[in-house]
Amino acid sequence: MTNCTVLDWQGKEAGESSIDLKTAKESSAADLLHRAVLRQQAHSRQGTASTLTRSEVRGGGRKPYKQKGTGRARQGSIRTPLRPGGGIIFGPKPRKYNLEMNRKERRLALRTALMSRIPDAKIIKDFGSKLEVPKTSEIVALLKRVGIDSDVKILIILNKPSEIIKRSIKNLEKVKLISADQLNVFDLLNANSLVIGEDALSTIKEVYGND
């Protein structure tokens, strides 16, 4: 179990919370997280690259010039890979890059990644509840009050972020906002700093703590 200090919007202590999720063994955690990140990145690839082979490239079957007497190397087709505009040998074709990983492993990897970041995470009570209009400066000021530089990669996890909060964060290039039920291993490990809404922490326990 990991205990967390809850901060208010001004960056002052407002209570405590705790979270306890099942994680992978230390001996296998690194391998599990590595496979989970590889899988996520592989699934983001489009796999639409395609080239034409010598049978698909445009052109006739006519011999470009006679076999003998030209002093040049013999050629049987203008579609040969040896000629400019000819077919491609072993070129890419549309394919899926998906990597298999069973559900238990995926959830275990996610919980392991999350619990590894919780000790350094900032838990904020009523995140942005007092914002009446979108103000990026308010988000920057909050990050500064809790000791986070807005120039580093920051992941903000909220339960149900409002449109005001989304628009307030939108202009911050290195700040990413995701919902508590949409967590993924790559974002958790890629961020330099983690900010979690207190209500989002409850959702995380509910969604990911049942295994």
Curated annotation (Swiss-Prot):
Positions of region (Disordered): 40-85
Protein name: Large ribosomal subunit protein uL4
Described purpose of this protein according to its UniProt entry: One of the primary rRNA binding proteins, this protein initially binds near the 5'-end of the 23S rRNA. It is important during the early stages of 50S assembly. It makes multiple contacts with different domains of the 23S rRNA in the assembled 50S subunit and ribosome.
Gene: rplD
Family, as annotated: Belongs to the universal ribosomal protein uL4 family.
Superkingdom, natural source: Bacteria
GO molecular function: rRNA binding; structural constituent of ribosome
NCBIfam families: rplD_bact (TIGR03953)
Composition bias type Basic residues, residue spans: 60-71
GO biological process assignments: translation
UniProt lineage: Bacteria, Bacillati, Cyanobacteriota, Cyanophyceae, Synechococcales
Xref: InterPro entries: Ribosomal_uL4 (IPR002136), Ribosomal_uL4-like (IPR013005), Ribosomal_uL4_dom_sf (IPR023574)
Organism of this sequence: Prochlorococcus marinus (strain NATL2A)
